[in-house]
């Protein structure tokens, strides 16, 4: 499961700065759900090839009389969702009573906690950090979040227990120069045909993992129980924590599935509960672990920013997507038309996803959901050979030639599969990374249409082909060497 890191500390110690630095390589998901404080942010981040979730637990002021109340509610819940807590303090401001109060509270929680002294750029880091040893910590890490110094070493150390061979040689907490970090993160991962075959084999050996996600009270619980009820599968009533989804194996039409239930543990008698506990972390973990994401939207409410945020997260994760517009029954035709127009207007960026209008309560349209789930999964995992992809690429370039870059025509040579779920097409050629975004979108849409891909995003990766003669030095023949000597001798005689 993807690990979760919580940033804790009093205001203005640099939590948001570190949050933005960690999540900048991918769109940060900012959650503003009912029941959550507005200043708590959840985002997806990456270290090396490993993903993790980071939470900015804003709103903790650490006041001596109010720390128990402040931390006991939303912020404490976020800390409990985390695998690792980064307790941030301000190296320039020094130790404060607020820091001591927060540290005392964190000691009561059995959670891996690391002390992070921020803002140590331009000052004596060791001298600025000395007072913080009073907090009784075993290890202290010094960083400058605004400039990225020490951040990679910190995160590698924090996540080392969750990933093998993560630590670099420079991970002892010292200040390191990361001025080129953005360029390193911008580099694309290179995919080979062997990687694609391995990922496809793993997918073929497993059941389809289907995550049902959505805002609170859109009908996820009702839909889950409707699906399970139709299949006569016992609803598991297992104890779970606030951050763990329930994995329910089921079978439909001879196909094995694992339903990832994010709506929480419920008994059959509680299907119509109006209050639902919502965990952002639980939802993000479910998306990361799923093959197909079923996003439930309430037809009686406008599409919200939270709907778009969840959809964007699933899209960034490369998951297949099916949309279910729930509570469709009872709406008059005029309202239905307005809802459809709103869907077309706001969800154009996922025009590849099937949309179903359903009633989870009465079962209307629920059975057809699995047709789209299977279609999306099939599109995401169907093997496509190099010859087919190369032929499609050549057809695309014949219909619309690549543009000129610095006076030279970009040349696309061949294409092969680089991965599945989502499908990744790797195109090799000259200057291919210089292609404008408009032409990249053209190629992506051309491949999608040609391969009849539906329900899943498709990714195109470009790799510049190596020049086999780049470092080659031609050896002169004997006659060429003699001619060269005669020419050099003539030049010398002319100078005399």
Swiss-Prot record:
InterPro entries: AAA+_ATPase, G_ENGA, GTP-bd, GTPase_Der, KH_dom-like, KH_dom-like_a/b, P-loop_NTPase, Small_GTP-bd
KH-like domain boundaries: 382-466
Protein residues bound to GTP 1: 9-16, 56-60, 118-121
SUPFAM superfamilies, A to Z: P-loop containing nucleoside triphosphate hydrolases
UniProt key word Secreted: no
Statement: the UniProt record of this protein carries the keyword Protein transport: no
Protein family per UniProt: Belongs to the TRAFAC class TrmE-Era-EngA-EngB-Septin-like GTPase superfamily. EngA (Der) GTPase family.
Name recorded for this polypeptide: GTPase Der
